[in-house]
């Protein structure tokens, strides 16, 4: 412990006592608030990817920059790069095709259809944790190989687009005809913090396939893209991997045929690397010393590169033409008998026991080896359903080529949203069901049409609560991760959304709005639903004494039922929507955490979320018409009463039961129950960050600001899927 003498002594020597010692004195060092309170609400997730982290500035327009790109010149440069072997990371057989295909695959393969997060859309492979995942060993080298090309073309091509395009060019240069390529992935400049990669604290912790159905996780082990190539938990049993493969690829939105095509296609080119024990491999990029300059996994085995490279620890080459597209994967799979063996690193794999040595060595032309396969490759032969598909592809290579081309396109574009977001000269013309296609607009309402429609809606007999609820139900399905959902298409009127419990009250307004649409003869139901919300908000603001114009951008269209994949749209059904005080399940997370999750999917900031919840409550927009959180005697009036009464110390809150999901607010003097609330309500008084925002809106001078902020956030949500307005 320091004494006054210690301080005097250091002062006498001219040294500041506070600059002594080994404590971390840097910004952000020391014990953090999350160390003290690990369950603290993650409001910070709503502040990701702001302009403060973007070196390009808020005026940068990627689509505009991309239009200046010499696209085919870029592809030519990528093609040349494939065979320009570098001594610091020599190319197998003189080609980086397999490496770039793996880079693209592993960038896109993190996508999870259950919550729309992950995927290649923002170039997240550059950042932790993905840049240092065990399954991404050596992909740091692939990205570094691409740097001269990225440097040459600058901001005309994003890293996110370049990763996927490099994979496409690698396939094409190997003799494969791809389905196409859509650009439009914009880079971000920091890791995504909202993606739940799992609770495990150790890499490669095994997960049971059944558990994947209960959580938004894509892989069966922490740190893998899909499954353990040695079988579940290193079982070495091909058949036991079938359930894990189905669960993982299913979470990416793939069926059995797409799964077989992707595994076989991805393993037609290139190899795995396991020249020696993985104990020779150094720390990953995030843990590597500063002089490594962002590279990781430096190996001390031999030269550490080329023939001595160690990546997964497996040493497998599937085909005899590993740099040229072929059907050899299936031919070898069924032609030979396979015996379990181990790689030089000790990993479980299989070798064709009755095959001649027909596989070329990647660095010594005088050497040959027998075909080898991963445990999970053999699953395609021994699982009955996978085997049927695999034999069909064996006997019909063109069917395999077509299936892989489409599955690869789906894999690499799954998180980009509708086709209208794609840019570039190689965008396929065909509409695909997983893109949630929409018909072309045939009519855009005039200003007079909009005025007439607003009058019709206002005179329809629908209340403010009903008008606001139906518009929110339509628009709030949007997911910022994969750009799915939203009001465009009016899929609220279609299956499955029309039957969701959360929409039970909201859809009661649909017959009235459908009648207005029919009488108008021109406007889309999608536009009318959003316009209903406009009318509701304007009426509520007027009732509060404010004349507010809610901006409305027409041009939405109505999807057909045959353009709507019911199974995939079921994934958009919320397990909770705190904006409507809805929660279907109590076995996942807390209500307030799920509110943050929903707000983050809607790309809302903390103030936007706060304004919307406060407004939705006083407008009576709870999914079931309950009074929870309706802290006002003027339902339907756009007031700041929610905040005023929430922060009023006259009321004391107590849980109604042990679940602590619902609460009663009693007058401290009389004991009378004045209000009821959910956790999604009380969090705005409990959480210190959200309370700070709520205090702004509860202030005596804040009513007009609150209304304006609510309207701005409301319009943002209504237009989240209007990519045509960008």
Curated annotation (Swiss-Prot):
SUPFAM superfamilies: Heme-dependent peroxidases
Keywords for the protein's UniProt record, in alphabetical order: Heme, Hydrogen peroxide, Iron, Metal-binding, Oxidoreductase, Peroxidase
Stretches the record annotates as Disordered: 1-33
Alphabetized InterPro entries for the sequence: Catalase_peroxidase, Haem_peroxidase, Haem_peroxidase_sf, Peroxidases_AS, Peroxidases_heam-ligand_BS
Highest rank taxon of the organism: Bacteria
PTM remark: Formation of the three residue Trp-Tyr-Met cross-link is important for the catalase, but not the peroxidase activity of the enzyme.
Active site: 106 (proton acceptor)
EC number of this enzyme: 1.11.1.21
Gene3D superfamilies recorded: 1.10.520.10, Peroxidase, domain 2
One Pfam assignment: peroxidase
Residues annotated to bind heme b: 267
PROSITE patterns tied to this protein: PEROXIDASE_1, PEROXIDASE_2, PEROXIDASE_4
UniProt-annotated site: Transition state stabilizer, residues: 102
Residues in cross-link Tryptophyl-tyrosyl-methioninium (Trp-Tyr) (with M-252): 105-226
Reaction(s) catalysed (UniProt annotation): H2O2 + AH2 = A + 2 H2O; 2 H2O2 = O2 + 2 H2O
The family this protein is said to belong to: Belongs to the peroxidase family. Peroxidase/catalase subfamily.
Oligomer and partners: Homodimer or homotetramer.
Purpose: Bifunctional enzyme with both catalase and broad-spectrum peroxidase activity.
Entry protein name: Catalase-peroxidase
